[in-house]
């Protein structure tokens, strides 16, 4: 998957969210990137961030186990023009996928965003498969005319992402509920208040790293 550190960090900038507070306490731990939630999106963010050169990354999960709602989903991933479709004798195209998405959205969706989703989904799919995780079947999802829903085992995907994160030095903490984001409109997120002692406060390393972000 071809992602530069600059493009990755630029993409993260749209996910910053915080509540305004006048004062932030001294943090117990400081990280360059704090990811809240350990589902597929959260763990993938942490892994790609670490691969992109961000050194101190932490994932906070409020449940005692990893996975979030990803662990209980059906595991269907709709992607067009894959080698798995070819092996199954399925003829598909990105244009057909695009048209199906427009129909499903009653043509109220933005065409450029649909194209972006299809392209980005393919990149992420290929990145996952290259890591050794394979779909077990290809079927039809609701709203799609052609079998392009690649069935994955959610437990296997989460386990794979966890192993990748650990190898890259990502710190993972479970049973940590994020209660409050502390900061202001001028400086952004300055600290994160959690529910787990003794580490009650985390903070993005914004004093030394101007590109730090917090992802929720």
Locate predicted features:
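N-terminal secretory signal peptides and thylakoid transit peptides that target proteins
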Residues: 1-15
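Short glycine-rich loop/turn motifs that provide flexible caps or phosphate-binding loops at active sites
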Residues: 13, 36-41, 66-67, 74
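Bacterial Sec-dependent signal peptides at the C-terminal "C-region" and cleavage site
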Residues: 18-25
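A short, charged/proline- and glycine-enriched loop
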Residues: 27-32
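N-terminal Rossmann-like FAD-binding beta1-loop-alpha1 element of flavoenzymes
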Residues: 33-58
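Short hydrophobic core segments
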Residues: 36, 206-216
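Conserved N-terminal/central alpha/beta ligand/cofactor-binding core
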Residues: 56, 62-181, 186-188, 195
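Conserved beta-strand-loop-beta-strand element in the redox core of flavoprotein oxidoreductases
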Residues: 182-210
């Amino acid at each position: 998957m071809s992602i530069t550190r600059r493009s990755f960090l630029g993409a993260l900038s749209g996910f910053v969210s915080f509540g305004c507070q006048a004062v932030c306490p001294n943090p117990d731990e400081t990280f360059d990137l704090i990811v809240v939630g350990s589902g597929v999106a959260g763990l993938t963010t942490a892994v790609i961030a670490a691969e992109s050169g961000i050194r101190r990354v932490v994932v906070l999960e409020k449940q005692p186990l990893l996975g979030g709602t990803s662990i209980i989903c059906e595991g269907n991933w709709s992607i067009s023009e894959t080698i798995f479709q070819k092996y199954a004798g399925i003829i598909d195209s990105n244009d057909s996928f695009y048209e199906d998405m427009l129909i499903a959205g009653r043509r109220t969706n933005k065409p450029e965003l649909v194209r972006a989703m299809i392209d980005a989904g393919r990149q992420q799919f290929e990145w996952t498969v290259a890591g050794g995780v394979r779909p077990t079947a290809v079927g039809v999802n609701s709203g799609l005319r052609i079998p392009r829903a690649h069935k994955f085992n959610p437990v296997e995907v989460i386990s794979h992402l966890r192993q990748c994160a650990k190898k890259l030095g990502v710190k993972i903490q479970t049973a940590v509920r994020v209660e409050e984001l502390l900061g202001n409109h001028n400086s952004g997120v300055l600290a994160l208040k959690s529910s787990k002692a003794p580490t009650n406060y985390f903070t993005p390393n914004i004093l030394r790293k101007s590109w730090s972000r917090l992802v929720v």
